[in-house]
């Protein structure tokens, strides 16, 4: 593909040792050479670095620089690329960029370098999204997941599914179009059914395991619930190790939901401390209680706090019922006091004495199936778009199974199989994708 040569600052603006300006395109080397005093860049080898100066229009020195040259196709974009390391001040970096643009080079749009890498075949769409995930990662495991995708572990998994679906389509099409072909396998429903079923089993396994990688990438919506004054806010503060929520002996002091984030052994929890659920005494508290119910409904993990020093109350029983079908950990707080609670808890802690918190953290990872992670656990899908497309492919394969059950013609199967194949291709970006690229790459920073 032929594109205009583009440039942008690739490092954050600010005072630093250096800033880097990236230039990519057919004229990258020749245009930069026009304003560079040093070696003739048109004659240097790829992957070399050169000292010199960027010159003003009148020939005076604008800045002392180091220039890295990457000749196509051995660059990130598969185009000629020049990276100019300038001094790291805001003004000087902007001035050097302006000087580059004066040569006729265009200012890059956000994400345009990564977009070119995709369009030129350097990376697929999954890898492009992985670059953004690395930039925005909030924990070490999220970086591991993104690096797996960047190194094609995810792409290979989807390619394998695509290949199996395509083989099935091809064999069915041969039966339809060339029934006289002696070597063609006769694709009866008895032969098609188990192969589609195997594909569905494989997809279901990927979706199940992808829930864990999605937790790692995006964090886990975790709601702390309990009746008033059982220690919810104290638990939040203990996990955060800071006074984030209001802690008081007065029932109902947390009148709204409070959000905070904590990194727990490579997994980010979005902690939501809710208002205690009871019969609210005023309008403001009622709003907080209503939001608590909504938070429970939307939560991926519920930390239900009970008071070990008191017997089970009506409010406790209501919360146990309200959360029984959720991913839930029942926590007994105030283990430093005599216990009167009649039911078993998963974990016993004392937020006052800071006891049992490490046990709780281990229980959280175990409940989310994020304990004892091994290298292959980071291979699965974590991106919402990928998971949605895989679910759509699954739906199409289920339509094939349904068509078989209703004894429909074999050519009907090919239609749904083709849809499944297209949905898998959309994950990688090698099928039709409309405005997806513009939307996706616009989320990148300029120098990417």
Curated annotation (Swiss-Prot):
This enzyme's EC code(s): 3.6.-.-
Identification of the protein by name: tRNA modification GTPase MnmE
PROSITE patterns assigned to the protein according to its UniProt record, in alphabetical order: G_TRME
Gene behind the chain: mnmE
GO molecular function, one term: GTPase activity
Top-level EC class: hydrolase
Compartment(s) where it occurs, according to its Swiss-Prot or TrEMBL record: Cytoplasm
Cofactor(s) needed for function: K(+)
Subunit structure: Homodimer. Heterotetramer of two MnmE and two MnmG subunits.
